[in-house]
Amino acid sequence: KVQLEKKLSGIYRHHVMNKKEPLVRGFDDFFMAPHSRYTEACREDILNNPKLKVLADSKEAGIYIVMAQEGKQIFVMGHPEYDRMTLDQEYKRDVKKGIMPTLPVHYYPDDDPTQRPILSWRSHANNLYTNWLNYYVYQSTPYEWH
């Protein structure tokens, strides 16, 4: 883990690095996803580990999805589960605490926190969770029909 100089907060553009993996099946070449964190995984450590496969990356937010052990371990560095208002609530909470947070990027129309945030990641998030459940949970879970 590497400490960031300031909190990474916002909606970032990501690029699919390995389109053959079922986890990213149906993803657009580029997609948006939320991040909200003070640390990041060390890029060099991930890239230099032959057991890890990077599936999606972002120039601004860093590595996003990493897989190991043929999908038995999947690491998502962002927050695709966030709803429209989650980053807004975090930002306003931190403002009230006097932390003076950076405005979440690519989130508010015209960077105006009084406006309703833009929701640009729902289809990606739904696809990610659907693929994970279908290809890495259901199809790999043994069962017997009696």
Where are these regions (language model features)?
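Pocket-forming structural segment of enzyme catalytic cores
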Residues: 2-85
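Acyltransferase
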Residues: 80-146
